[in-house]
């Protein structure tokens, strides 16, 4: 075991500080889906995502937000409807590559490579970028959840089921059935979250993921 700076402990398997417990070898968290049925694949991939939970953050609130997000993705999300908000048509068939790429992305976000080690520099920076994106995604998910817990709010349905907050962002989508809130604050919130969610979908489309 090696101590790296104040509050940081480095072991063969992980680097632990006040914010993260980052893993060094992510291979055991990857998924070999050979011979698995679709149902088995979904269960196995879900377990892999949940096993990464301790490495997302040392803060219980962040870990709980991560678990809530993964649960929503697997149990409730209408992904084709969500993608349609950016004009991308896809069916509801299981795309294993998207799930595996998403798992790899989260694993990178939870892994550590010393940026000072020559050829590993770009890989380390890639991992850092994944970690920053995941952090932002979970922050936005937490904030949206906070808004949906308020009384008399329709935002839960908008954020998780209708995705109407992205309609004004994507001008090609007809938004006649959607009236933005009269409150400037609520309208701004919807615009900000709509822009972020749209960017995540564009990233998914670019990297063949399903975040």
Curated annotation (Swiss-Prot):
Cross-referenced InterPro entries: Irc19 (IPR016613)
Record key words, sorted: Sporulation
Taxonomic superkingdom: Eukaryota
Biological processes annotated in GO: ascospore formation; double-strand break repair; mitotic recombination
Family: Belongs to the IRC19 family.
Record's function text: Involved in sporulation and maintenance of the mitochondrial DNA. Is probably involved in a pathway contributing to genomic integrity.
Protein name according to UniProt: Increased recombination centers protein 19
